[in-house]
């Protein structure tokens, strides 16, 4: 069951039905990069069903939020956290935020490096192991990785600071290398040797492993587990088509597509949140 209030649902439905949609005007979607595969398919199915096109821009959630807050043209904003869309709502720029999907963090590990959930922390702390993350604040994936480091202190005193200092923030920043077009940037960094272990979303780790034979996915042990709540908002003055698309994302059909790409429905726990 998708977590949103009755008032929000009724308001969105009312906006969606307020006037006939102009199929010639695409819905403008800004979404977290980790949603690219899932929401591309969602948008394709929505367009086939409704005749309404979706024009998508994917990137680091924080960077997209800053762009929208500065006046960038957007209608539907889907973030890898709740805080970024909530800040737009608090500023009076958008509708109440909907929690529409959940993810969790995993460790993407280079081939031949022996790691299990039980040995992951000790392995990340080794001097000869390169640790990669995304960029905190700009990209929620980086914030979630640093939440893992904070939890590590409860397992081994002082380890959190050590991990923060050694972690290379390789993705998600304004000047981060993008990697080959159409390929996993996380798998690329691991394949190129810039990281032996990369903390990233489990959904992204699956894509990286599929593209890079031999790369491993290691689940975080319960004491380090961090889940990711994904929030969506619709910008004020958006056309009815934008609300229709937002409703489609949280519909049974939209949620089935998200689940196919590894995302969990909001009612299902994906590890303790940050």
Question: Across the structure, where does each feature detected by a protein language model lie?
Answer:
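Cleavable N-terminal signal peptides
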Residues: 8-11, 21
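N-terminal signal peptide c-region/cleavage motif recognized by signal peptidases
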Residues: 16-19
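Exported/periplasmic ABC-transporter solute-binding proteins
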Residues: 23-72, 79-82, 86-90, 98-103, ...
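Bacterial N-terminal signal peptides that target proteins for export
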Residues: 1-9
């Amino acid at each position: 069951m998708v977590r949103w209030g009755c008032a929000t649902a009724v308001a969105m439905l009312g906006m969606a039905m307020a006037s006939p949609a102009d199929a010639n005007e695409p819905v403008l979607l800004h979404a977290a990069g980790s949603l690219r595969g899932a929401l591309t398919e969602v948008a394709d199915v929505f367009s086939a069903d409704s005749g309404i096109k979706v024009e998508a821009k994917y990137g680091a959630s924080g960077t997209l939020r800053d762009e929208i807050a500065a006046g960038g043209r957007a209608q539907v904003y889907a973030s890898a956290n709740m805080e970024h869309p909530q800040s737009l709502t608090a500023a009076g720029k958008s509708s109440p935020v909907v929690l529409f999907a959940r993810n969790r963090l995993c460790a993407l590990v280079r081939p031949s490096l022996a790691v299990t959930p039980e040995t992951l922390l000790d392995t990340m702390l080794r001097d000869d192991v390169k640790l990669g993350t995304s960029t905190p604040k700009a990209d929620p994936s980086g914030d979630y990785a640093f939440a893992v480091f904070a939890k590590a202190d409860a397992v081994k005193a002082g380890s959190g600071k050590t991990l923060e200092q050694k972690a290379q923030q390789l993705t998600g920043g304004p000047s981060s290398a993008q990697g080959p077009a159409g390929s996993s940037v996380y798998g690329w960094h691991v394949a190129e040797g810039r990281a032996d272990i990369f903390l990233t979303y489990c959904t992204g780790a699956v894509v990286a492993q599929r593209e890079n034979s031999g790369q491993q996915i290691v689940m975080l042990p319960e004491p380090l587990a961090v889940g990711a709540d994904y929030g969506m908002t619709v910008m004020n003055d958006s056309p009815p088509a934008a609300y229709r698309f937002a409703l489609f994302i949280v519909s049974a059909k939209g949620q089935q597509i998200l689940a196919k790409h590894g995302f969990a429905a909001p009612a299902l726990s994906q590890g303790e949140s940050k």
